[in-house]
Amino acid sequence: NKIIDETFKTNVFFKFECFQKSGSFKARGAINNILSSDKEDLQNGITAVSAGNHAIAASYVSNIFKLKNKIFLYESANPYRVNICKNYRANILSTNATNAFDEVRKAEKEGYKFIHPFDGAYTLQGSGTLGLEIANQIKNLNTTIDNILISVGGGGLISGIGSALKQFFPHINIIGV
């Protein structure tokens, strides 16, 4: 964007993950978890916990791969997000934030594979695919990247992107916002 570039006196690039099918980057980690799992680990389905975006991603992915699911949504979840999960045929269970991960552990004992919202190697690798895309896009523009601003919630996004980008641009400053 010329106005932004001129304002900051540098090239500024944006990566809009809101245009992903599930509405956020969260599907990357969920998909990578599924693709990296043994069939036996998925035979009873998946479980996830979230206030919104990860629940949508887990619902989306379980629908694509035709997996049973138990999606724990916080009682405070936005009704719009709840409806998106329902549209992906999610088995939604309401929980409070205090007991949410306890509920997921119970589902794990029933044989459901837990897809963590921001932690675990497969989740971080999924987020890392975003870093690979950014690196390829920057290289295709025959330029480099000195700084990147990445939003921080649970830390999975910045960890995945940062790890990937450091492989291509060791000098990069990774800034959490």
Model-assigned labels for residue ranges:
Residues 1-177:
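PLP-dependent amino-acid enzyme catalytic core
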